Amino acid sequence: MSKPSDRINLTNQFLIAMPNMADPTFSGTVVYLCDHSERGALGLVINRPTDIDLESLFNRIDLKLDIEPLLHIPVYFGGPVQTERGFVLHEPVEGANYNSSMSVEGGLEMTTSKDVLEAVATGTGPKRFLLTLGHAGWGAGQLEEEISRNGWLTVAADPRIVFDTPAEERFEAALGLLGVSSSMLSGEAGHA
């Protein structure tokens, strides 16, 4: 068992699925890790838009959204856990105190309470955000095991990829942070 000081902390990192990813749910994905500790990990897939947009989701939860540029922003598949629950990854809003927010080491926040969506609907919420349904979760040691089996690459997250890069370009953009492209990846791990 490793000592706490020996553990790596992957909070505020991207997980980039390797070509040999066994779980098709995560094939080709980039996951933003919101929390990683000895108890496990929680992240949001940032490159799987659904066919649901903000307007239709807000209608479902009885919120009126009249801000034209926001109406057709896609809602993302955040992962296979709690798929009926919304998770908002966003930049902090000065003076805002949402009911259920978690500050992510590195400057972003993840909020799961409806009040952040109410603020978005009135134009007082975060300007840069990504809304997912569901999240990805790993039990204690599970993510570390997947990484050791060459299932994921990790790299420090860049908010510009989360918020400014088109969804279909996020996988390559995240790989670019490592100086590689998908054409350079192999599903085979080498061990010396």
From Swiss-Prot:
UniProt xrefs under InterPro entries: AlgH-like
Coiled coil: none
GO cellular component: cytosol
Superkingdom to which the source organism belongs: Bacteria
Gene3D superfamilies: VC0467-like
Family label: Belongs to the UPF0301 (AlgH) family.
NCBIfam families, A to Z: PRK00228.1-1, PRK00228.1-2
Protein name: UPF0301 protein BamMC406_0754
